[in-house]
């Protein structure tokens, strides 16, 4: 029914995906995932787990990855707005150590596909945001890894507004830098 617009990003393997939205006087309808449309676009992943979180403005989650059980993720903002980031940790990649960020919102309905081999995180820009993600592997708490969100070697340009108070978990404050991150 739907069909999707798939835009490759500057880093190979990352894609911004825009669904077809059908609007009328009742509201709108869209398919957030259709396996046939994704396969037709060359995106041949299998999702095994869906997650959803709610966060308030200034929450910064990340940058996370799993080492032995890496996860590809299809992420979107169900409500509110986030700045979503992926950092390439694939050692053989031409863009190793580079990052890409995109604004995802309930209004723009964009989704972001991040394959295995990336660190991932997001910053909430709206008063609240509900964030949904489909994963290609299950969450394994003992396999979790991460890197500092503000590592100057990577230099992610987070859109932190003047006066915005960041809310970062104790765990995320303790991650090492890019040099200490797991390499895929």
Enumerate the predicted regions with their spans.
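Short beta-strand His + acidic residue motifs that chelate non-heme Fe in jelly-roll/DSBH
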Residues: 112, 120-125, 133
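Non-catalytic, conserved peripheral segments adjacent to functional cores
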Residues: 1-107, 126-128, 135-184
């Amino acid at each position: 029914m739907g069909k999707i617009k798939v835009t490759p990003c500057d880093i190979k393997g990352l894609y911004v995906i825009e669904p077809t939205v059908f609007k009328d006087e009742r509201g709108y309808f869209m398919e957030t995932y259709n396996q046939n449309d994704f396969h037709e676009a060359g995106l041949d992943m299998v999702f095994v787990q869906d997650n959803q979180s709610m966060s308030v403005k200034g929450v910064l989650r990340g940058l996370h990855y799993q080492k032995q059980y890496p996860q590809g993720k299809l992420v979107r903002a169900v409500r509110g707005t986030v700045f979503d980031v992926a950092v390439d940790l694939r050692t053989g990649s031409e863009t190793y150590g580079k990052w890409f960020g995109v604004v995802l919102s309930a209004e723009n309905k964009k989704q972001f596909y991040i394959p295995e081999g990336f660190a991932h995180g997001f910053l909430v820009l709206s008063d609240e945001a509900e964030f949904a993600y489909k994963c290609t592997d299950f969450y394994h708490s003992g396999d979790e890894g991460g890197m500092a969100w503000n590592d100057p070697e990577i230099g992610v340009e987070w859109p932190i507004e003047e006066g915005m108070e960041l809310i970062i978990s104790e765990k995320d404050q303790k991650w090492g830098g890019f040099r200490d991150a797991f390499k895929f």
